[in-house]
Amino acid sequence: MALNKNHSEGGGVIVNNTESILMSYDHVELTFNDMKNVPEAFKGTKKGTVYLTPYRVIFLSKGKDAMRSFMMPFYLMKDCEVKQPVFGANFIKGTVKAEAGGGWEGSASYKLTFTAGGAIEFGQQMLQVASQASRGEVPNGAYGYPYMPSGAYVFPPPVANGMYPCPPGYPYPPPPPEFYPGPPMMDGAMGYVQPPPPPYPGPMEPPVVSGPSAPPTPAAEAKAAEAAASAYYNPGNPHNVYMPTSQPPPPPYYPPEDKKTQ
């Protein structure tokens, strides 16, 4: 746990270039107790913003308080609990130890009160990230930022509570591979094989047009007219035409003899 080592002159929070801000909440109050020799910076109630990174919790106070920033790494925190009192805002409490060169000594009990809400969400995320960090896992959404010459990155104060946005000009980290899955590999045994097209017969030959036939004779025309006149058409069966059977020609006509000649 370090004192006044994670803030900038412009009011932003400073983290290492291998960290990222996972979550932040404004309108948070921080108090300490159970300290033998209470330094001046630990007295009273601190008001500001709390940040969650993959490896620690950082509190950034507002105003001209002697405690400008306060950092608590997970490996120095214990007995963390989320409390929901009947009266008052929800809060997170626990114990933290000082680290070597952190600006103070000993241990202290802390209390983070979320006056505008968010204690349950922040506490659940903090416990999950701390558990992953203890196993050496990289928490979800924890992407490192490009190398900075100073070895740190300055985040401006957040606009609103919730997830902290990426800094301006920094390309958003690529989504995990399972976020935009590509098309599944097709099994060869299940693939659909289109049959080949039928053989092409080639261009069709133009129809053969016979030459002009001989003009019909008057006798043929008369015979056709006679057949058409004697044909029978049935409307119920329009595809068939009934024609009478061929009969022998009638006998020759003889004019009656003149009675006078008889």
Curated annotation (Swiss-Prot):
PTM annotation (Phosphotyrosine): residues: Y192, Y232
Places the protein is found: Cytoplasm; Nucleus
Span of the annotated motif PPxY motif 1: 196-200
Repeat as UniProt keyword: yes
Cellular compartments per GO CC: chromatin; cytoplasm; nucleus
Any matching Pfam family: GRAM
All copies of domain GRAM, residue ranges: 1-84
Keyword Membrane included in the entry's annotation: no
Compositionally biased residues, Pro residues: 197-206, 246-255
InterPro entries: GRAM, WBP2-like
Composition skew (Low complexity), residue ranges: 219-231
Motif range (PPxY motif 2): 249-253
GO BP: any one term: progesterone receptor signaling pathway
Coiled-coil region list: none
Keyword set, alphabetical order: Cytoplasm, Nucleus, Phosphoprotein, Repeat
Disordered, as annotated region: 197-262
Post-translational modification: Phosphorylated in repsonse to EGF as well as estrogen and progesterone hormones. Tyr-192 and Tyr-232 are phosphorylated by YES and SRC inducing nuclear translocation.
GO molecular function, one term: RNA polymerase II cis-regulatory region sequence-specific DNA binding
Predominant place of localization: cytoplasm
PANTHER family: WW DOMAIN BINDING PROTEIN 2, ISOFORM E (PTHR31606), WW DOMAIN-BINDING PROTEIN 2 (PTHR31606:SF4)
Free-text note on domains in this protein's UniProt record: The PPxY motif 1 mediates interaction with NEDD4. The PPxY motif 2 is required for the coactivation function.
Purpose of the protein: Acts as a transcriptional coactivator of estrogen and progesterone receptors (ESR1 and PGR) upon hormone activation. In presence of estrogen, binds to ESR1-responsive promoters. Synergizes with YAP1 to enhance PGR activity. Modulates expression of post-synaptic scaffolding proteins via regulation of ESR1, ESR2 and PGR.
SUBUNIT field: Binds to the WW domain of YAP1, WWP1 and WWP2. Interacts with NEDD4. Interacts with ESR1 and UBE3A.
Record's protein name: WW domain-binding protein 2
Organism classification: Eukaryota, Metazoa, Chordata, Craniata, Vertebrata
